[in-house]
Amino acid sequence: MSLTAASADRWMPARPGSEGVLALGMARLILAESLYEKAALAANGLHAEDLLKGVRMYDLSRVAEETGLSQAVIAEVAREFASTSPALAMAGEAVAFQSNGPDSVRAIQMLNVLIGNLNRPGGIYPDAGSPEGPTNSLADLMALITKMRGNQIRMALFYGDPVHSVPPATGFQEALAKVPYLVSFSSLLDDTAIMADLVLPDHAALESWGDVIPMAGTREGVIGLMQPVVTPLFDTRQFPEVLMTAAAEMGGQMKAAFPYASYLEMLRADVKKRVAASGGTDFEAAWVELLRTGGIFEANPGQLRDYRWSGGANVPAPAKPLFAGNEKEFPLHLSVYPSTAFFDGRGAPLPWLQQLPDPMTTAVWGSWVEINPKTAAELGINFGDLVEVTSPQGSLRVPAVIYPGIRPDMVAIPLGQGHRDMGRYAKGRGANPLQLLAMTKEGSAAQPAWNGTRVRVARISEKGELVTAGHPKGSYRSDLIEI
C-alpha cells in the first residue's frame, strides 16, 4: 500500500502484472451496460460494438481469478468509475515496470477513452507545445553497455549516479570498469564519482540557473524557470557551462552549435524565442515578469493539441506477466519503490531527510523490508527481526517491518539507501534493493525485472537495526533537533 493507496476510499491489491486485465474487465462491463460516453467514442472514431468484441473474453469470472479480487468489488468500482465525472484512471510505475507493462498501461488508458476523459479538465491532456527533450530507452542503455564491454567507449561523462541507480544485473557496473576515462559532475562523491578519473562539481540547485519542463501533459505550456538565490559557495561550475566551454575548445560545428558566452545567455535566448512565439515584443519586460512569476504558464493557441485513441478497435491484450525466479524456490514477489524522502537515492546524504519518518512505516535512518503479517507468521518473523532477502540475482539483509498494507505473496523494499559513499550520512547505510533485480527475457530482448523479480525471505536473528519514530521501546532519538 502506497501513500496514494492509503489515502483512497478503497484499496484493490491486484496480483502483480494483472492490472491490465482488471482494466479490460472494467471496460467490458462499461461497454456491456452502455455506461460509456457515446460522443467520446465517436470523437475517437470508435464503435462500442467493435470494442466489446475485443474485451468480451474478459468476463468478471476470469478477471476475478487472475487479479485475486472479488467479482462484486470489480463490478461496483467499474460502475462507479463510469458514473462519476470527472474520473481518472492512472497507471503507475508498479504497472509500467512489469513485463506486460506497455499493454497494461494502454488498457488502463482505454478506460479514460470510454468515459470521455481526454482533453478535458480533470482528465488527460497532451503536452501543449512544451519542448520535447531527448529520451533514452532501456534498449539505449543496453546498447551502451555492449559498447563499453567492447572497448568502444574511450571516455564517459556522467551527470547523475548510474553506478547506484542502474541494476547490476544489466552488467553496467562491470562494463563501466572497461572505460579508460570517467568524468563525474556530481557535487558529492557518490558511487559513480568515486570511480571517476576527474570530478568537476556542479553548482548546487540553489546556485543554478535552469528551466524545468513537466513530463506530464498540461493544457497550458508550462516551463518553470530556475534562478539562483545564493552565490556559489565553492569553486564550482554549472554542468551546462562546462559542456559549452568544451564545445568552444573543440571548435568547428561544436562551437557553432553553442554561440553563447554563458549558460544564462543561452537560457535567455531560448526563452526569448518562446516569448516571441506567444506574440510578445518587449523581451526585457517579459524576462523580469518571468523571474517574478517563476516561468511560463500560458499556451500558444496554435500549439494546442488533442489526444486521440490511436489503436482503433484493436484492444490491448496484456500477456501473462513474466517473473524472474522459480515460484517454488522464490515464492514472493518483490516490489522496489522510490523512497518518499530520497526518491532513487539522490537525497540520502541529507540528514534531515534521513530523519524524516517514512509516512507508512515511520522507519528512519535505514532500509527495511515490508512483509504481510500472515506471511511473517508463517516464516516466524517478528517486527524488527533481521532477515535475508534472496533473489536469483543476489541477496541482502535488512530488518523486517510487519505491514498489513501489502499482499501476502509480496514483499517491498524502498530505494534510496545502500550507498558505497556519498558522504557520512549516506555511506554504508541500509541496502540497495536494485542488487536483487534479475533480468527477464521475452524473445531476444532482456530487461531488468523492476517489478518482476521473485524472492524468498528467511529470518537471521532477532536483532535488526530498525529505527522508527514513536517506537514503543524508545529506539527513536533525535540527535539533530532537540526541543
Please annotate each region the language model reported.
Residues 1-7, 11, 15, 130, ...:
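A cross-kingdom feature strongest in bacterial/archaeal respiratory oxidoreductases
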Residues 36-41, 88, 119-125, 254-266:
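Flexible, glycine/charged-enriched surface loops at secondary-structure junctions
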Residues 56-67, 124-139, 230-232, 250:
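Acidic/glycine-enriched edge-of-secondary-structure segments
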Residues 44-45, 94, 99, 125-132, ...:
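A glycine-rich phosphate-binding loop feature that marks nucleotide/adenosyl-phosphate handling sites
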Residues 17, 21, 46, 58, ...:
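Conserved active-site and cofactor/substrate-binding residues in soluble primary-metabolism enzymes
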Residues 81-150, 215, 302-312:
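A glycine-rich, hydrophobic/aromatic-adjacent loop/helix-cap motif
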Residues 238-261:
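Non-catalytic, well-ordered alpha-helical segments in soluble enzyme domains
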Residues 1-85, 91, 239, 249:
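Long, well-ordered, tryptophan-enriched scaffold segments
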